[in-house]
Amino acid sequence: MGAKFSKPSQAKDSAKVENLSLQHHLINYLSKSFYIRNLVSKQRRRMLVAGYDLDMSYITDHVLAMSFPAERMRAMYRNPLWQVKSVLDMRHQGHYKIYNLCIEESYDPSHFHGRVESFPFDDNHVPPLQMIKLFCENVSSWLSSHPKNIAVIHCMAGKGRTGLMVCAYLVYCGMSPEDALQLYAQRRTTNNEGVSIPSQRRYVGYWAKCLSFPKGVYNGPPEVKLPEPCRRELQRIRLYDTVNTESIFFVVSELQEIPSQLYRPSMELTRNRCRQFKKGYERNDSPRYFLSFVEAKNKGNEPELEPHLVVQMDTECSALYHKTCLDYNFEKPLPLTGDVRIIFYAKMFGGRLFYACFNTAFIKNSLLQLRLPDLDKVGKKGRSICGPSFCLELVFGPANAKHSFFTPSDDENASDDMS
């Protein structure tokens, strides 16, 4: 009986081998097609090395950014892994380490002699500040261990997440956030648009505020002081100057820390919708809270600044009475701590309009306001509901005085786009 089935089985195996061989030749041919990969890489700079056309750029002499080193069918439009390995071995034999920022895909570290580190976070989003710290310390340690060492950093497309972490390292080395973002944009793209997602740029600014250089810039690594976890209570979400809609849905999430795991998944806390309120409606169930510093005389009759909690009701200017605003007032304030993500949708499930990420430790005066340029991935549908004065406003309850008081000088010196 076995002899009767041997020929069909052999024919099937032979066909499988032939198909795999054909697939390999097809991938090899298409991976050499400059057109396909140039189309996918868009405005990212490419390198032509040893006949290979690769999506990679030197940001500095020791930091290289690139797209994902792919295998199989994905190699048709990403960097083929074997070509990346060949170029790195040729240029930096024994002196390169790969940093993979993808959570969605990985590869066998043995392809790169085991020198692969993983710092995964979600595409088009931000990592926790603790991960940025570990990443910068790891890169610094590797580069300082030998003058020829380089760090090769990639996500999937090799632009947003890669840019955030490259810029974070440049800031760690003493550059300002603005200079780091500008350098990355110039070296990585042809249109000078490097890290284009506002929340990712915001986190580069957050990271800069965690660093100090007591020995001076370029005299050793900086001191890193991450903010203590700061609990804030979200009381109201308001969308100013909306058009063509009577309600917008939202989802609020936090990055959840998991023991012994570097990746922090987003955990949904609540979902609801902002609705249009009637003009003249008194929203006294959700006042604004502010910390006001006023002069108070002590026993020595010398004026001192003392923080006082001030409750201010809604007092929009008259121009806003003619605008449509969408509100959601929390019956019970929503506690938030650390890294927060808020996404807005046209429908309860699906139809994303835009989103924003922020850290609660960097909120000033219990108020966070983001205009259209400060929001992430605003598409055609998102823009269609935003008027010229559109603004997202999040109102929080009193801050934890121990960790998040901002003095008047703090408020004056902090830039709006890093809020």
Go through the PLM ranges and name each one.
Residues 1-17:
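PEST-like, low-complexity acidic/proline-rich intrinsically disordered segments
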Residues 2, 35, 52, 160-163:
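Glycine-centered flexibility motif
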Residues 15-151, 172-182, 187-194, 236-419:
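Cysteine-based protein phosphatase catalytic domain of the PTP/DSP
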Residues 146-168:
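A phosphate-binding catalytic loop at a beta-strand-loop-alpha-helix junction
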Residues 161-168, 175, 179-180, 196-199:
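Long all-alpha helical scaffold domains
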Residues 168-172, 205-206:
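Short, hydrophobic/amphipathic alpha-helical patches that form generic packing surfaces
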Residues 189, 193-230:
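Catalytic cores of secreted or luminal carbohydrate-active enzymes
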